[in-house]
Regions:
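Hydrophobic alpha-helical transmembrane segments of membrane proteins
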Residues: 1-87, 97-281
Length: 281
């Protein structure tokens, strides 16, 4: 199986879907209820505030919830495979290592991200329906603003009138960063067998804190905006932005390569903590 086959990949993806679909639906239902009750509590605790401010607080909550949910889902992509019966069946699938690897990564990246978003939309809708029926409130959804927060800045006009090159570089750096973060959590999911999300997140936070400290001490600019009092003057793209636009994709490629290399070495019996036993290499 040296060549990639979309037919084998489709069958492997279908197997991954069938093995995880029930838990996906259960988690989606649970997430929807969490969002509903959390939004109701936020609304109740901030009754004296304006609707705009309450929606802003809810938007912050669901954004953090979404990011944590996606990170946790990626970290758990090989959780079921770590169970011996599932691991044996998965390793015996009539597909190449690349096809099996991509089927798992694609499912837990796309399917779980979509379902987490749907759970947020359902929970937000339940809150609007409940408050409309009980309190007579108007229907104010947080979803449009939530979607706008992930849109590239060059797709809409800014009140600061940034140049197109500035907006494009922002989008490039953000995209590169997202791919690097995804590859980092994918590597953690492939390498670790226990406390994957916690250990990967702690390592990620340490790297970001170290990077921030280095940048702060070296005074390297990422993006700059010059103001004179309350008047916006100009903007610029710093050297660090160009460096990150090149380095982050390279680091992401290394992470994906390392993750796939570990995946190819999956054994039916391995140690308790990792999927990579360096003593056997």
């Amino acid at each position: 199986m040296n060549s990639f086959s979309f037919n084998r990949f489709r069958k492997a993806l279908r197997w991954v879907w069938s093995m995880n679909f029930r838990s996906l639906m259960m988690w989606t239902t649970g997430f929807s209820l969490v969002i509903f009750f959390a939004e109701m509590m936020i609304w109740y605790l901030n009754t004296g505030m304006t609707t705009e401010n309450i929606v802003g607080i809810i938007l912050l909550f669901i954004t953090i919830f979404f990011m944590i949910g996606v990170g946790a889902s990626i970290s758990s992509m090989f959780l079921e495979v770590n169970k011996k019966p599932r691991r044996e069946a998965f390793l015996m699938l009539p597909a190449s290592n690349l096809e099996k690897y991509l089927s798992v990564v694609l499912y837990f990246t796309v399917a779980w991200t979509v379902c987490i978003f749907l759970s947020i939309a359902v929970g937000d809708t339940l809150r609007m329906v409940f408050r409309s029926l009980v309190s007579g409130d108007e229907w104010v959804s947080c979803i449009p603003r939530f979607i706008d927060s992930f849109m590239p800045s060059f797709l809409y006009r800014s009140i600061y009138d940034y140049t197109l090159s500035y907006k494009v570089m922002q989008a490039v750096v953000l995209t590169a960063m997202m791919f690097w973060i995804h590859s980092f959590y994918t590597l953690g999911a492939t390498l670790l067998r226990k406390y994957t999300f916690v250990l990967t997140s702690l390592t990620f936070i340490f790297i970001i804190a170290l990077f921030g400290d280095v940048v702060n001490n070296s005074r390297i600019e990422l993006f700059t905006a010059v103001w004179e009092g309350d008047r916006y003057v100009s903007q610029g793209v710093g050297t660090l932005a160009y460096v990150l636009a090149v380095v982050l994709p390279l680091l992401a490629a290394i992470n994906y390569w390392a993750s796939f290399h570990i995946f190819k070495g999956f054994q039916l019996i391995t140690n308790k903590w990792t999927n990579y036993d360096i003593l056997k290499r």
